[in-house]
Amino acid sequence: MDSNDVFKKLKSLANPKNVAGMARFGINPKNTLGISIPHLRKLAKELGKDHQLAQQLWDSGIHEAMILAGMVDDPKLVTKKQMDLWTSDFDSWDVCDQVCMNLFDKTPLAFQKAKEWAMRDKEFEKRAGFALMACLAWHDKEAGDVRFAQFFPLIKQAASDERNFVKKAVNWALRQIGKRNRNLNKMAIGTAKEILKMDSKIAKWIASDAIRELTSQAVQKRLT
């Protein structure tokens, strides 16, 4: 299936009724077709890995095509330049998160980029840094605790950022790292307690929400 066939397929799956619903969840409705993630996953499975196709999909600027690009790209072929270019194109939280969880967290540059982007000013670039931290904590089964411990100062530093899509990603990263194992759980709770002392409503929300989950019986039972 070449890129023209893929774009035809995407248009055939379009559901304009879904676009309004997506907008209510804070998803940018611009260039959006209203295709569900399960439909995109199914199409990605049919297409297999294709680095060139991924670039063509991304360059289209179509919301779902950009998500699909992250699903079909080959993480072994992704460069630092591509990661920065794609991140600078993020204009919706779901594209950001899907690309981080389907592609970026599988690249050798993931830990480096998470730290870099967490220091950025643009809302979705900054979100990408913390979303990538959360995805690495969720998916990377081999990385040691030291690599995740390096994220805590960045989480603390961004905890007073009032922008909705940043604060939620900071909270997500803190919770996800803290659910990885018992040692990181203690470190995450300690970081949350430090954040709780900050003179910021946003910081207090991030910290209290994380502490509530990380100290819960359900999470504590699963820790090793």
Sequence positions of predicted segments:
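Alpha-helical scaffold domains
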Residues: 1-224
